[in-house]
């Protein structure tokens, strides 16, 4: 046996995980909720984390966000939402259509950010009672609904899809009337 044995093969260096951003003073209950969310999202094919600590799923044409947060009373909430459209002219017809659609949904609802002409589809869960299977079903419902209606909203009311640049803005269709 030689005095200077060959070195053992080097083990692969562990993948370095970048620290994920977290809101300042995030309670331990939200940290625990994040562990459940991250575990479930990892089984769904991956995710990104934005600068605010929100989880982002870039599936299809509507980005979906999963946002764990807390209320002043200590309760935790998981907000799951997709921003479907931007730069949509806000009209009475649009708001009526959104409200009528909301009556059809079992889970979730459309919301309108008037200032940005943004349409969201969202559903919230009570974090302290949320189970991984419930989170998965909620994410699936939000993604499916957002992708089902985003093109229709663009065609009927103008604006653009969330994933399109400003060059994708479609003017609203001409209103029938006098001329």
What do these predicted ranges mean?
Residues 1-65:
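Charge-rich, low-complexity N-terminal segments
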Residues 27, 31, 88-92, 129-136:
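Ordered, soluble secondary-structure elements with a strong preference for glycine-centered loop motifs
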Residues 47-53, 70-74, 112-116:
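Short, ordered beta-strand-loop transition motifs
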Residues 65-87:
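A short acidic-to-branched-hydrophobic micro-motif
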Residues 79-122:
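Short, internal acidic amphipathic alpha-helical interface segments
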Residues 137-159:
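A conserved amphipathic terminal alpha-helix motif
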């Amino acid at each position: 046996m030689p005095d200077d044995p060959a070195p053992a093969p080097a083990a692969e260096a562990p993948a370095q995980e970048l620290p994920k951003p977290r809101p300042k003073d995030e309670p331990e209950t939200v940290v625990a909720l994040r562990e459940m969310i991250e575990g479930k999202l990892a089984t769904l094919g991956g995710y990104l984390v934005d600068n605010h600590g929100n989880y982002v799923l870039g599936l299809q044409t509507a980005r979906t966000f999963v946002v764990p947060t807390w209320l002043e009373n200590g309760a935790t909430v998981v907000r799951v939402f997709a921003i479907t459209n931007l730069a949509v002219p806000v009209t009475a017809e649009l708001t009526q259509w959104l409200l009528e659609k909301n009556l059809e949904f079992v889970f979730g609802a459309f919301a309108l950010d008037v200032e940005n002409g943004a349409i969201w589809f969202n559903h919230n869960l009570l974090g302290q009672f949320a189970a991984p299977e419930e989170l998965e079903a909620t994410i699936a419902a939000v993604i499916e609904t957002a992708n089902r209606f985003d093109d229709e909203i663009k065609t009927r009311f103008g604006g653009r899809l969330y994933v399109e640049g400003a060059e994708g803005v479609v003017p609203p269709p001409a209103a029938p009337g006098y001329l």
